[in-house]
Amino acid sequence: MSQSSLPELRVSKAGDHVVELNQRLEHDGYLFFKRLLNPDRLLELRREMLTIMQEGGWLVTGTDPLDGIADPAARSTEGDLEYTDVYHKVYKLQAFHEIAHCSEVLDLLGRIRGCEMMPQPQKVARLWFPKYTDHTTPIHQDFVHFQGSFDTYTCWAPVGDCPTELGPLALVPGSHKVDKVLDHHFSLGAGSLAILEEDLGDQWLSNDFEAGDTLIFHSLTAHQALPNLSEDRMRVSLDNRYQAFGIPIAEQMLTPHLSNFADFDWEDVYANWESDELKYYWKQYDLEVSAKIETWGRIGFEEAMALTRDGDTNARHHLERMVKRDPEGEQSVSAAKLLGV
């Protein structure tokens, strides 16, 4: 697909009638708002995040962190230990977690869905290096990763302007109406699972995004990141997820993101916060917690093993990173045996 020629997302306005917005969300599986979030607040967060990334060696020394000029020698992605080290330093920022609780999103979603909504504890940042396109987030439905209930919603927002060449999200409108999880297969990229493009329609939508623009979509809406084709700029974005209080939340969403890749817990996250207000905020509620469904991850692993046997270099790379991260894990032991390491 040519990302420069994709049709644009339909723009909604926060002031539109809630019945109309809810009908649109039910029909299209998404809502796109211009400048829903405060751009100045996002740019302040951007400086904090990118300053840490520069201190971690990801950005060119001496450049303005706001410009996000990547050092290609530091290139890494989710699944690499060197990525997790810097990522978790960013993850500790109080402002990064606070923005998920902003009234602009919480109040709007509450009005649209007709009930009080909660941001899930596990917040996610996506920090993508330029021209590392093999690791672009593939086509998927969020439910395979975040689970709990179909009736959850992702709020995606770039931290700064994100033109199409920088790799914003693209989605297939109405794809959530299948009302089920589609088949997912092994892939590189965040989550390591992908829907085959031929299993979907070809009506992909995307946009140039400005700071403050926000895309909200259903857990079954098929979407992907477009590749970061910029010459030298990092793509930085937020993935926050919301649900009503009365539906299940999956156990993994109560832990910090990528804590399965490193020794990292909420006490690490909160160590330098200046306020206690949002610490463990979800524990005041009687939440129904569901066990993580391992099915899709197991399918992806088995496919990666089979592909590696057939000489697939991407699958081999995936298994090598797994063994490096967690050499004693059950799947890693099997992978190491196959790899001969």
Predicted regions and their residues:
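Double-stranded beta-helix
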Residues: 4, 11, 164-224
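Non-heme Fe(II)-dependent double-stranded beta-helix
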Residues: 2-28, 34-139, 145-146
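Non-heme Fe(II)/2-oxoglutarate
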Residues: 3-10, 59, 221-321, 333-337
